Amino acid sequence: MAAPKARALGPEEKDECMKIFDIFDRNAENIAPVSDTMDMLTKLGQTYTKRETEAIMKEARGPKGDKKNLGPEEWLVLCSKWVRQDDEEEILRAFKVFDANGDGVIDFDEFKFIMQKVGEEPLTDAEVEEAMKEADEDGNGVIDIPEFMDLIKKSKNALKEA
């Protein structure tokens, strides 16, 4: 498994991450020992190889960071990676459900089925076709996994802004 990329955390996500950090900040010194990282990862349901963990830790600490301890900022960098990974796994599971024939793409009929189920009112074929054109970034007539992830992320962002 490749180390996930970081993403910005919302206020609630930051609060949750810091609650976990506080558990590992045993002496209330605003630090958590790096040696506990594997334990932290396991308790959070994350499974990385030792090499992946070292790469994540190196990125979180930065070039001049403390090699033995993590501060709150470094912890939030780590947390942002896990949150993004969970989001992507959830989107991938949804994609597999919507890809009814399992061919790795969502075609017009599968997309129409999705749009009919999530919309409040039934859409016409023309409306579905227009929505599909917007989601189909490369114009090949189907929606692949990266396009589906972009579609979901855009939808989430639109809902947050509304």
UniProtKB/Swiss-Prot annotation:
PROSITE patterns for the chain: EF_HAND_1, EF_HAND_2
Keyword Ion transport in record: no
Keyword Repeat among record annotations: yes
N6,N6,N6-trimethyllysine found at: K96, K117
N-acetylalanine: modified positions: A2
Residues reported to bind Ca(2+) 1: D99, N101, D103, E110
Keywords: Acetylation, Calcium, Cytoplasm, Metal-binding, Methylation, Muscle protein, Repeat
Subcellular location: Cytoplasm
Gene3D superfamilies: EF-hand
Cysteine pairs bridged by disulfides in the record: none
Source species, domain of life: Eukaryota
A GO term, aspect molecular function: calcium ion binding
Pfam families reported in the protein's UniProt record: EF-hand_7 (PF13499)
Principal localisation: cytoplasm
PANTHER family noted in UniProt: CALMODULIN LIKE 3, MYOSIN LIGHT CHAIN 1, 3
Function: The exact function of this protein is not yet known. It interacts with CAVPT, a protein also of unknown function, in a calcium-dependent way. This protein binds two calcium ions.
Protein's name according to its UniProt entry: Calcium vector protein
Native organism: Branchiostoma floridae (Florida lancelet)
